[in-house]
Amino acid sequence: YGMALFSKSFSFREVVFQSKSKATAELYCSLLKELCSIKAGIKASPSGKIYTVSVKKAENVARIMSYFAHDKSETSLRINFSNFDCEECQSTFLRGAFLACGAVSSPEKDYHLEFSVPYMNLSKSLVTALQEKELAPKVTHRKGYNIIYFKDSEEIEDCLYIMGAGKSMFDMMNVKIVKEIRNTA
């Protein structure tokens, strides 16, 4: 759900997902097939750096919207929290949202994790979802996007853990330990 909702386009006209990672685009395709019985293809940009999955056929778009309990009466895009049946559902959702619109900096350089969201109400819903996981994101605006971000290394570690990125969390902790040792030596 997170990958679809935070994709390039999630509307009753079309659902379009873009990623710099072919593996992520392939995951999106496999989830569309598994959850909604929709077979979609991946198109690479001319440079080969962006992979796009588009669903434009009206009946397929309607199937996706119905599966995630969105209807045409909605005036703005928001997270439908009724899609979360369990604690893990929300963590999986956050992982998908991160794959669709998130970025994290290398801990060797800086501590920064962000979600870049074009819609105000959707970004507010994401802040609420993160706060429900006892995280305290900050919000700013950049180039027409709402940026939900973390700068504190411990908050980033917690967010990574919640999203199921345990290895990345431990990698970050190790870098932080090395930095602290170097600073005290």
Residue ranges with predicted function:
Residues 1-27:
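N-terminal ordered "arm"
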Residues 19, 26, 30-36, 42-44, ...:
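DNA-contacting interfaces and partner/effector-binding or oligomerization modules
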Residues 177-185:
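Conserved alpha/beta core segments of nucleic-acid transaction machinery
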